[in-house]
Amino acid sequence: MKNLPFLILVLFSFGSLPAQSIADCPSNLSIFAEFAKVKNYDSAYSHWLEVKNRCPDLNEATYIYGERILGYKIKNEEENEEYILILSSLYDDWFSYFPKDRSGRSQRGKIFSSKAQSMLEYDTAPLSEIYATFDEAFTSDMESFANPRALYNYFKTLYTMYKNGYDNVTMDALFSKYEDVSEKFVIENQKLSRTLDRILMKEDAGKTLTSRDKRSKRVAEINSRANSTYKNNLDAIISQEASCENLIPLYRSNFDENKSDEKWLKRAASRMDAKDCSDDPLFVELVEALHSLSPSADSAYYIGILKDKAGKTTEAIAFYEESLTLESDTYRKAEILYKIAAKLKKRGLKSQARKYANQALSNKPSMGKAYILIAGLYADSANDCGNNQFEKQAVYWLAAQTARRAAVVDPSLKNTSQKLEASYTGRAPTKTDIFTQGKAAEVISFDCWIRSSVTVPNL
């Protein structure tokens, strides 16, 4: 630390020299990196260009910082064509010299999805070429194609082409690509959830988080929010096309061709269920074909839906339970449990709905939406629980507490959680009510299906 002022002086002294006079690539690397860290991209540029041109395989920082430096130049220089051309070639060079990350895993998907992103952002190529670049990155290396913004723009580019009437971009192709990208979002979300769940379990056990834990949690929360935002945007786009009026004839026309394709059947059934098209006879055909082809957690769940629709709740729950037995992955099981809870909530089976929501949380502690569902169950029971008006309204405190927990385990739900908490709290007894009834700090127990209690706030 004592030498820091001297180091800064040295760096700025170097910065005043022309890049051509500094022959040592490692020195240039250090100089441009220091400038780039403080976003002084103009000063970084000449030193960076020297390293890129003379020592392209020296360090991957040349490409990581180069992307930022060139992006700045493109946005801030009137004559930016040169920088656009350099950026275009930067990604090709990046993959040529650093095709794998430090763990030995391919970076093709990451690098070329970034290239497609830059092509889109700076409008340097036709949409078809931008999409082809995204598509090559995704199909050749889906593992490292993980940036949520790039995933969203990958699909949005195809959607724009579809709406503009591009040849060969059919509705079928659009839905198929949506499923591909949506499933990738799920995979990335599961990775983030595993990190958050590990840390949440440590916190719940009363253990102290290490600095590494805190950093991992912070990064996972930030990425989780971004993932959730772009996934919601993706769903918003497809919802414009995914009506029952569009889905049913589309899947009907393709059914015979795909009735032996397990993946296609699962996707079609899932989409029809999500859009509440399960009353159509086609849904029955899809489910029966899927179950006869390969009895699985998915097919058993969909049969449960059919039984539920027919009012056969006991049989429906039996198939839901079979679905859970057939599913070995805890995170997929959590999603099934949540969907079962949501179905039961719609049918007014509150106690059973909470049971499945809590089981979902046991499998995935970071599933904030399960807390949102339970909070809604409590709020819907305000008139059914409690021996007097004060106790009936007190149920809203329990609902508010539960809604608050959603944001604790899943920060991407912060806005929803806060709005619900405020809404429920606003319907709970006021300070005047508490004072008048003399209930401050009293514990109120609910003998209805809730079988829980809440402590009245202190004045």
Per-segment meaning from a language model:
Residues 33, 68, 117, 156, ...:
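Residue-level recognition of tetratricopeptide repeat
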Residues 51, 94, 137, 289-290, ...:
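Canonical positions in the second alpha-helix
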Residues 20-282, 293-294, 418-424, 434, ...:
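Preference for long, solvent-exposed alpha-helical segments and helix-linker "stalks"
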Residues 48, 84-91, 134, 287, ...:
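Hydrophobic/aromatic packing residues within the alpha-helices of TPR/SEL1-like helical repeat arrays
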Residues 301-314, 321-368:
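Alpha-helical adaptor scaffolds
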Residues 58, 295-296, 332, 366:
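Short helix-capping/linker turns of helical repeat alpha-solenoids
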